[in-house]
């Protein structure tokens, strides 16, 4: 068994748990977690959250105290601009989500996270997660890879917004994430692509012709 922070965790049947659990699968894509590390990591995802469509997972000005794993459902992250809401990202089944700047800096969030459908999530407390990161190098490596992937995605998106036409941005998104057009309302996609809804509708219509 493994003893850590007054927890005693048996390691029997860890193999079957790993094979079935998508959280462990995602971490193992980035780092070679041992069975003990996998078991410990999984034991802290204890908070279950259920959201209805339009419910908020995180609100602006509130501190982000959790990292979430989406079991089912679709959510959007948006910035509450005075003139209009600016969609900055979306998350789906089997992915992680949080108000990232707030989670990392331990400061109030500037963003809202809202359910676009019925959602079921698991959550780990921020303090518990960073204890794991600080005490287990394999978990720290996986977290670093997740952060690096997010940073690369942000840079690539910024370049697309600055250099591509609205039509080209649409085509890139369709190629990269075709599922978004089935899961997310068109007005939010238009906001994410920094284009008018009418332009998005026109490009969508043109794509269907081809």
What are the residue ranges of the model-derived segments?
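Short, Lys/Arg-enriched N-terminal segment that forms or immediately precedes the first helix
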Residues: 150-159
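A cytosolic small-molecule/anion-sensing beta-strand core signal
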Residues: 52, 71-72, 92, 117
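Cyclic nucleotide-binding regulatory module and flanking cytosolic helices
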Residues: 5, 10, 14-48
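Cyclic-nucleotide recognition modules
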Residues: 86-145
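Glycine- and acidic-residue-biased ligand/ion/polar-headgroup-sensing regions
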Residues: 65, 69-76, 94
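Short phosphate-coordinating micro-motif centered on Lys-Gly-acidic
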Residues: 57-62
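Short beta-strand segments in beta-sandwich/barrel cores
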Residues: 56, 74-79, 96, 120-121
């Amino acid at each position: 068994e493994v003893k850590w922070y007054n927890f005693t965790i048996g390691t029997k049947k860890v193999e079957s748990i790993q094979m079935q659990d998508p959280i462990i699968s995602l971490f193992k894509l980035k780092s070679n977690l041992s069975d003990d590390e996998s078991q410990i990591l999984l034991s802290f995802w204890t908070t279950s959250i259920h959201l209805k469509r339009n419910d908020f997972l995180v609100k602006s000005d509130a501190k982000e105290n959790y990292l979430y794993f989406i079991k089912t459902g679709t959510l959007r992250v948006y910035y509450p601009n005075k003139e209009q809401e600016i969609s900055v990202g979306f998350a789906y089944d089997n992915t992680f989500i949080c108000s990232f700047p707030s989670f990392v800096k331990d400061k109030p969030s500037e963003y809202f996270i809202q359910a676009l459908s019925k959602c079921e999530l698991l959550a780990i407390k921020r303090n518990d997660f960073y204890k794991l990161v600080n005490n287990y190098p394999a978990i720290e490596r996986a977290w670093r890879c997740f952060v690096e992937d997010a940073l690369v995605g942000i840079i690539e998106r910024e370049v697309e917004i600055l250099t591509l036409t609205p039509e080209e941005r649409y085509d890139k998104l369709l190629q990269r994430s075709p599922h978004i057009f089935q899961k997310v309302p068109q007005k939010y996609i238009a906001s994410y692509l920094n284009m008018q809804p009418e332009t998005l509708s026109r490009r969508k219509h043109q794509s269907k012709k081809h």
